[in-house]
Regions:
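N-terminal targeting signals for export/organelle localization
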Residues: 1-53, 183-200
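Short loop/turn microsegments at loop-to-beta-strand junctions
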Residues: 49-50, 72, 148-149
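Residue-level recognition of short loop/turn positions
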Residues: 58-60, 157
Length: 200
C-alpha cells in the first residue's frame, strides 16, 4: 500500500508543471513560438543564471560555469517518462555528432528513483545527467514552465536560443544545435577586411 501511495504521488508530481520558476519577465515572450518550439533571435535572448550546480548520477559535482563558452543542450527527463525513452537515441546521436564543435549536453533527471535513473541512462546517454528529484536544479534555469521532456539549447553567451517543449527527434534537434554552434564566438576577434589598395 505504501509503495502504491508513493508511486501515485510521484506520478502526480512528475506529470505536473513547475510554474513560476523563472523571472517575472518571461524570456519566451521576447521570442517566436511555433507549435512546441520557442526560437529566440540573438538580439532577443536573455542570459540565464550562471550558477547552475548539481550532483550528477555518478555522485560527482557539476557546475554550468565549467561549460562557459560552449553551446549547452539541456534535456529534462525521467525514467518514468515514455517520450523520454523515445527521444533518448536521437539526443545521443546529436551529441556524438556535435561535441567536437564545442557543444556540451546535460541531462536533468527529475522526480525519479536514483537507481531507476542510472539504469535508464546506462547504454542510452554518454553525456552527464544531474539527479534532481525535487526539481530545484531545474528551477535554476530561467524558464517559467519545466515539463518533461523538454530541451533547451543555450548559446555560447549563456542565453536560451531554443526551447523544445516536448519530445524531440534527431532531424529536428541537429539543425538547431548546428545553427547555434555556428554563431560567432563572443570572444572571437572581428574578421579583418581584405585590403584592395593598389589592386588593378
Amino acid at each position: 500500500m505504501r509503495r502504491l501511495v508513493t508511486a501515485v504521488v510521484t506520478a502526480a508530481l512528475a506529470t505536473g508543471v513547475l510554474a513560476g520558476c523563472g523571472s517575472g519577465d518571461n524570456w519566451a515572450k521576447k521570442c517566436t513560438t511555433k507549435d512546441t518550439v520557442v526560437e529566440c533571435a540573438p538580439d532577443r535572448r536573455t542570459p540565464i543564471k550562471q550558477d547552475v550546480k548539481g550532483q550528477l548520477l555518478d555522485g560527482t559535482a557539476y557546475d554550468l560555469a565549467g561549460d562557459k563558452g560552449k553551446v549547452v543542450v539541456v534535456n529534462f527527463w525521467g525514467s518514468w517518462c515514455a517520450p523520454c525513452r523515445a527521444e533518448a537515441d536521437d539526443l545521443e546521436k546529436t551529441y556524438q555528432e556535435t561535441q567536437a564543435k564545442g557543444v556540451a549536453f546535460l541531462g536533468i533527471d527529475s522526480r525519479d528513483d536514483k537507481d531507476a535513473a542510472k539504469a535508464f541512462a546506462r547504454g542510452r546517454a554518454t553525456y552527464p545527467s544531474i539527479y534532481d528529484f525535487d526539481g530545484k536544479v531545474a528551477q535554476q534555469f530561467d524558464v517559467t514552465q519545466v515539463a518533461t521532456p523538454q530541451t533547451l539549447i543555450i548559446d555560447r553567451q549563456g542565453r536560451i536560443a531554443y526551447a523544445i517543449r516536448g519530445a524531440t527527434v534527431y532531424t529536428q534537434l541537429l539543425p538547431m544545435v548546428q545553427k547555434v554552434a555556428a554563431e560567432a564566438h563572443p570572444t572571437a576577434p572581428p574578421t579583418a577586411l581584405k585590403s584592395t589598395k593598389g589592386s588593378s
